[in-house]
Structures are given as structure tokens and as C-alpha cells.
């Protein structure tokens, strides 16, 4: 049977989401799988909606795993996966929180059934840096920026494009994505002046794409790059060394959208077919 997990984590002290083979590197996947396996007394392999990089956070991550029904017949679970929330809260470190465990609807796949992923990048240009209570999820930028110039640079990126200039190379992986939203917001307050957020939404993202999009717009906003910088990058045919990558600490995955339950399987099949048809896709 398939189980859906809804979880959050502070990515600061993790080497990203993905387990690194047999390595003891601390990753979100390794910590979760090890603890789930201990509770369920069976090996667990997680599939996730968004494979976040080292230092990137999540407040809305979704994963799934398959497990024999008998593994849920523990005395403390009694076949009710929701009881895993309390069990895991006693075992997991403070920088991971699993807040939802449920039977997955038929056809659900955390990765391929997803319609879109939502990210927020949080950054301050104040010379004092971020609030001490937000220092782990807010990046500091050393120069003032023009938010309207950044929005103009972001607008040209909306739509279906090959974002190869913004993506780190990955063998046999497509870099074609549909960027559905990229908006900049001044969210300054009296206690957090010169604070900005980028809201970025796409059907999926390739490795390092969001941080490269943000860094490119910030370069335009501070005047280091011309206003047509991002438009020029869209014409590239390979990863550009000119693309600045924003620090990981400012980025958070904040949500994953799925279709209605009766459309989950069709969406997963459609996504697999499209990825397979794209140039360079596996």
C-alpha cells in the first residue's frame, strides 16, 4: 500500500534531500527513511515531490512510500497511519517535522502526479542583515536593489522555455520547464526593512534553477547586469558561467499542487510521457 507524507524541514544542517548511496552524510531522506524503517520494522524508500539542494528548506514538502499492510499492524499504530505523526515526533530531530501521514489515494505519485511546485526566496539588503530569528531562512545581499527592474527581468522568463542556462548539468535530463509565476514582493516591516521575497512557481524545476533565476534578477536589480540579461540567457544552449546562483539559505519549498483524486493516475502518466518525449529526457 502507498502512504503519503506531508513534512517540513530546516535545510541548514542537511546535505540536501537525497540519500547519498551508502554514505553517512546527513540528508533529509536518510533521516526519514532510517526512522520510518525503525518504526515500521521494514525498509522504506521515499519518493519526493521536490528534491531540494543542500541548505534549502521546505514548509510544504510531499513524499510517498510503499509498505506491506502488515507493517502498519504495530501495537502503537494499529493500522492507522495517522498515528505515525506522534511516533515520528518523538524520534525525529527538531529540524524535521512530519505533520501528515495518510493512505495515498489510488494513482497518487508524490513526484509525477504533481501539477506545480511553489518556492519562496527570502532576501534582505539591509546592512545589518536578517533578524536573528530568521537568519537561517533569509539570505543577505550586499547591495541595494531596484525591485521593479527585477520584476521586469523576471517577466520575460514566464512560459515554456529551455532553461539550460539556469540549470546545472545532469546527464540525460531535460531542462525544458514551464515557469508559471515569478513575482517579486517588497515585504519590509519596521523590524525587517529592505526585505524582499520572490515567489516562483513551475510544473517542475531542474537542479539549481530557482536559485539561478533569483540570482540573475538580483544582478539586474543591483545594476551589475543590463535589463535584457535574463532575456539573453534564454537564448543560451548550455549552462552559462555568467549566471549568479543565490545562496541556498533563502530558498524554501512552500507547496505542491495536485489534481483531484480521480485525475492523479492520468496526471502521473502524462508527466512521465512528456518527460520522456522531451529532448534529453530519460
UniProtKB/Swiss-Prot annotation:
Catalysed reactions, semicolon-separated: uridine(38/39/40) in tRNA = pseudouridine(38/39/40) in tRNA
Asked if the record carries the keyword Nucleotide-binding, the reply is no
| Protein name from the UniProt record | tRNA pseudouridine synthase A
> Which class of enzymes does this protein belong to?
isomerase
Family, according to the entry, reads as follows: Belongs to the tRNA pseudouridine synthase TruA family.
Q: Does the keyword Glycoprotein apply?
A: no
From which source organism is this entry? Answer: Corynebacterium efficiens (strain DSM 44549 / YS-314 / AJ 12310 / JCM 11189 / NBRC 100395)
The record describes the protein's role as:
Formation of pseudouridine at positions 38, 39 and 40 in the anticodon stem and loop of transfer RNAs.
Location of the active site? 53 (nucleophile)
**GO MF annotation terms:** RNA binding; tRNA pseudouridine(38-40) synthase activity
Spell out the subunit comment. Homodimer.
Q: Which PANTHER family match?
A: PSEUDOURIDYLATE SYNTHASE, TRNA PSEUDOURIDINE SYNTHASE-LIKE 1
Record's SUPFAM superfamilies? Pseudouridine synthase
Q: Name a single GO biological process.
A: tRNA pseudouridine synthesis
Q: Which domain of life is it from?
A: Bacteria
Q: Which residues bind substrate?
A: 119
E.C. number: 5.4.99.12
Q: Which HAMAP family match?
A: TruA (MF_00171)
Keyword list, A-Z: Isomerase, tRNA processing
Which range is the signal sequence, renumbered to this chain? none
